[in-house]
């Protein structure tokens, strides 16, 4: 009886492991060529080649330590998107990415003066401790003069794991999904980061 239970337990563990490893074979992974910035699809088991860099298999979370530059994986995702946009005769570029906490404080203070209250300013400039710019996980694209390229990124950004997040900021993008996933619905403004 005991041998039967051990054997059944072994079969159960083996079948679970087999399912997990098989499922990993089907999880797509976007790999960007370091020279051309073009993408190739692999999977999380095979990974990327030495001449490539992974765009990641998930959203890019905040670092545990406050960074001093734009998140490297976010930059890879943007460069891949930029190369694809160029193939479609569109130009996209980062106007603002990583900001120091001090810079975000200054921008927020200026917005409070401009809009007359913290609540109103927060709709346009996230408070320093809420904003994703000081964490290197947000970019502003083509602002203020070229919304067409940013529109291309809004339509195609999901392929690279980049999503527009605020209805009132056509220029603001964040890596909130894995490349290829569907972007979440837009929220009205930056105050929704506070909720």
Task: Identify the role of each PLM range.
Residues 18-97, 101-195:
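Extracytoplasmic cell-surface/polysaccharide-interacting catalytic and binding patches
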Residues 7-8, 22:
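Intrinsically disordered and other compositionally biased segments
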Residues 8-15:
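Bacterial N-terminal signal peptides
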